[in-house]
């Protein structure tokens, strides 16, 4: 039976008169899948419901933050109790201490942390700190990696920028862009060449230890280690953008999983439990350069607000090492089911995984960087997305975004998803 999206269509027609493109973040417009966005109403566990009453198994999870699934009862209870006491004070609260300690305990190389209100704020602040500490201006990032919408970072970016086919953004001054150098992800030799030419001018390398905004692209062997060596040799800082990978890839984040310690880590998503949050952390020597301890300025009205700190603490305190065994078990089943169905119906495919992040690509080429990610059949992906939605499976509406698993997902959810793969691929093969 074909699902009705009539109320979503009406809501979108109204929204486009009120907000640019009808949304408050570009990827939500569903442009790359050639349909109007689906407006959501509620979520419980791994299931969400749209305003037309259609239900879905959710693999978007608000683009990653909801690692416990939707409306976890203990998290909801804690948020409500905190809200009843006050949503923000403009003064410190002890919950900031609790979340800070919890995060730092799981990141042994990080000694101090500053909370902000978004991942973009975290990466922008991390770059300012790196430039302030080193006295240098240039940075190196990787093509297709998305680090938020700060001017310095909207150069050959992924995520919604890639989805819309915009390699850069108008409004980024040329004087800013010239200080951002780029090479392909996983291209250590390219990074070495940049350092040979600009090593004395490079403040930092910023990298997703697992790229998550060109699909899911893990680092090849030696890539992160090589960046660590390059930055240390040339007096630059290594920034791991773990806004997406933080507590998704492993209990100790991607840096713990791969055994490479950066100078600065940026975080977001999971550490806010579904509320707006970001953070940057580093060694005490670096972080004590941040105001008011040091001269590098950073501030925020709602930074460390009680609601986000409470949601983050209640979420992280419910993750232990067994959580990631659960993710691996379900991820194995989901990957095997996708591969089996795609192979059965001769659908070109590649699967990349890292912890509870999974990337399905419609290409037979190994996906190791943005160029190979773009070899995926985008028209096929769009049809796949629409048909999976009809089967009650909600996926990211972009080839360049990964799927997420939560603790609320079960083997039954995975089995239903795999059954949908078979049904949809049978239709695509006709």
Swiss-Prot record:
InterPro entries: 4pyrrol_synth_GluAld_NH2Trfase (IPR004639), Aminotrans_3 (IPR005814), Aminotrans_3_PPA_site (IPR049704), PyrdxlP-dep_Trfase (IPR015424), PyrdxlP-dep_Trfase_major (IPR015421), PyrdxlP-dep_Trfase_small (IPR015422). One of its GO terms (molecular function) is transaminase activity. Its cofactor is pyridoxal 5'-phosphate. PROSITE patterns: AA_TRANSFER_CLASS_3. GO terms for cellular component: cytoplasm. SUPFAM superfamilies: PLP-dependent transferases. The modification N6-(pyridoxal phosphate)lysine is found at residue 269. It is found in: Cytoplasm. Its main location: cytoplasm. It comes from the Bacteria. Keywords: Cytoplasm, Isomerase, Porphyrin biosynthesis, Pyridoxal phosphate. Pathway: Porphyrin-containing compound metabolism; protoporphyrin-IX biosynthesis; 5-aminolevulinate from L-glutamyl-tRNA(Glu): step 2/2. Its EC number is 5.4.3.8. It catalyses: (S)-4-amino-5-oxopentanoate = 5-aminolevulinate. CDD domains: OAT_like. One of its GO terms (biological process) is protoporphyrinogen IX biosynthetic process. Homodimer. HAMAP family: HemL_aminotrans_3 (MF_00375). Belongs to the class-III pyridoxal-phosphate-dependent aminotransferase family. HemL subfamily. This is Glutamate-1-semialdehyde 2,1-aminomutase 2. The gene is hemL2.
């Amino acid at each position: 039976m074909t699902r009705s999206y009539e109320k979503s269509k009406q809501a979108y027609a109204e929204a486009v008169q009120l907000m640019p493109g009808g949304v408050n973040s570009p990827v939500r417009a569903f442009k790359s899948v050639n349909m109007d966005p689906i407006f959501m109403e509620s979520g419980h566990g791994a299931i969400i419901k749209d305003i037309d009453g259609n239900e879905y198994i959710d693999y978007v999870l608000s683009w990653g933050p909801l690692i416990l699934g939707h409306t976890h009862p203990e998290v909801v209870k804690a948020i409500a109790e905190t809200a009843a006491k006050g949503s923000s004070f403009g003064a410190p609260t002890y919950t900031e201490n609790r979340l800070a300690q919890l995060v730092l305990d799981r990141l042994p190389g990080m000694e101090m942390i500053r909370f902000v209100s978004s991942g973009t704020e975290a990466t922008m602040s991390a770059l300012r700190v790196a430039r302030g500490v080193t006295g240098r201006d240039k940075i190196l990032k990787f093509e297709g990696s998305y680090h938020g919408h700060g001017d310095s970072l909207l150069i050959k970016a992924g995520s919604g920028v890639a989805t819309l086919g915009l390699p850069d953004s108008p409004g980024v001054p040329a004087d800013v862009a010239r200080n951002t150098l780029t090479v392909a992800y996983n291209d250590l030799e390219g990074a070495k060449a940049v350092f040979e030419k600009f090593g004395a001018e490079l403040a930092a390398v910023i990298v997703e230890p697992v790229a998550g905004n060109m699909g899911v692209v893990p680092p090849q062997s030696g890539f992160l280690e090589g960046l660590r060596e390059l930055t240390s040799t040339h007096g630059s800082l290594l920034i791991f953008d773990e806004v997406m990978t933080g507590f998704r890839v492993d209990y100790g984040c991607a840096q713990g999983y791969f055994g490479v310690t950066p100078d600065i880590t940026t975080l977001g998503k999971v550490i806010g439990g579904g509320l707006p949050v970001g953070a940057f952390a580093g060694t005490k020597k670096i972080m004590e350069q941040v105001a008011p301890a040091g001269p590098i300025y950073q501030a925020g009205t709602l930074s460390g607000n009680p609601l986000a700190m409470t949601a983050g603490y209640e979420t992280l305190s419910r993750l232990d090492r067994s959580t990631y065994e659960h993710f691996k078990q379900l991820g194995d089943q989901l990957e095997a089911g996708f591969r089996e169905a795609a192979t059965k119906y001769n659908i070109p495919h590649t699967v990349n995984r890292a912890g509870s992040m999974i990337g399905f690509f419609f290409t037979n080429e190994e996906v190791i960087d943005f160029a190979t990610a773009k070899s995926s059949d985008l028209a096929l992906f769009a049809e796949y997305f629409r048909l999976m939605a009809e089967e009650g499976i909600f996926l990211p509406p972009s080839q360049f975004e990964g799927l997420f698993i939560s603790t609320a997902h079960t083997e039954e959810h995975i089995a239903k998803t795999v059954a949908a793969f078979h049904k949809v691929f049978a239709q695509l093969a006709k």
